[in-house]
Curated annotation (Swiss-Prot):
Stated name of the protein: Uncharacterized protein Mb1302c
Record keyword Signal present: yes
Domain of life: Bacteria
Record keywords, A-Z: Signal
Signal sequence, renumbered to the chain: 1-19
Cited InterPro entries: DUF732
Family (UniProt): To M.tuberculosis Rv1291c.
Species in which this protein is naturally found: Mycobacterium bovis (strain ATCC BAA-935 / AF2122/97)
Amino acid sequence: MLSPLSPRIIAAFTTAVGAAAIGLAVATAGTAGANTKDEAFIAQMESIGVTFSSPQVATQQAQLVCKKLASGETGTEIAEEVLSQTNLTTKQAAYFVVDATKAYCPQYASQLT
């Protein structure tokens, strides 16, 4: 279970997720040539400088974002989990959530703002 975070950290996550969600609308150039959802997700993450030692594991984790959104977790809560379980920066964790949503469950995009 995650420990409670200070309001300042939560505000930073909320801002990062919100900014990433806004960027979602304009950041499609990196995925224009992708053939699958997995390729689109990996290409988008690579466009912000994130690479994965196992793209397969990364895409599996990205698909879990949708399950968490479906169960009622917020984008901020999910980004906090990603941040605590990876070596991604706050901004990268936020983009992970937004890019996963874009690739695998765009119907939940409105939950990210």
